[in-house]
């Protein structure tokens, strides 16, 4: 039996300040939440309950929630802190179908493309994120978001869906 001795040094480059602050959330199963956020969805819309699991360590824990699937677009209003340095929008969704892609608009300005390539028909819940730059969020307390699904490849169906959103502001 041979014993090995390991030495190491760990450097932590962190800040004592909070850098992300949660400012809002939208629950697709709550009519009150949808109304408060002025949530609208267009196109072919299907609303269904999904019971499945997330990938990862707790991949045997079932979660049940409502999912909005659509081919048109969705829009909603979120609350942010005016002195933010950008916003992170986190979506909870069903990843059964691959290549979920949508163009994101913030107050009528193009914020870029949100793309989720992965799929998992067995562990269907996933959370993914979209970063909204400070140039579109600074000095605002409310953002009007528009999500317009698009197809990544010719002949591929549009496959965007939403179960919940969480909003985080980058702060100094």
Task: Tell me what each language-model feature is.
Residues 21, 56-84, 92-172:
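Beta-strand-rich ligand-recognition modules
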């Amino acid at each position: 039996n041979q014993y090995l001795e390991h030495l190491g040094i760990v450097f932590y480059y962190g800040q004592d300040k909070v850098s992300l602050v949660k400012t809002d959330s939208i629950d697709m199963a709550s009519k009150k939440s949808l109304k408060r956020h002025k949530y609208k969805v267009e196109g072919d819309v299907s609303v269904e309950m999904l019971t499945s699991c997330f990938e990862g360590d707790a991949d045997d824990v079932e979660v049940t929630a409502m999912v909005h699937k659509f081919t048109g677009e969705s829009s909603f209003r979120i609350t942010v802190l005016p002195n933010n340095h950008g916003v992170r929008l986190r979506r909870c969704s069903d990843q059964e179908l691959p290549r979920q892609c949508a163009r994101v608009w913030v107050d009528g300005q193009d914020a870029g493309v949100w793309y989720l390539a992965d799929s998992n028909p067995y562990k269907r819940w996933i959370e993914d994120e979209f970063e909204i730059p400070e140039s579109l969020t600074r000095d605002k307390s409310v953002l009007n978001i528009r999500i317009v699904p698009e197809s990544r490849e010719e002949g591929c169906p549009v496959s965007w869906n939403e179960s919940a959103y969480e909003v985080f502001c980058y702060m100094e």
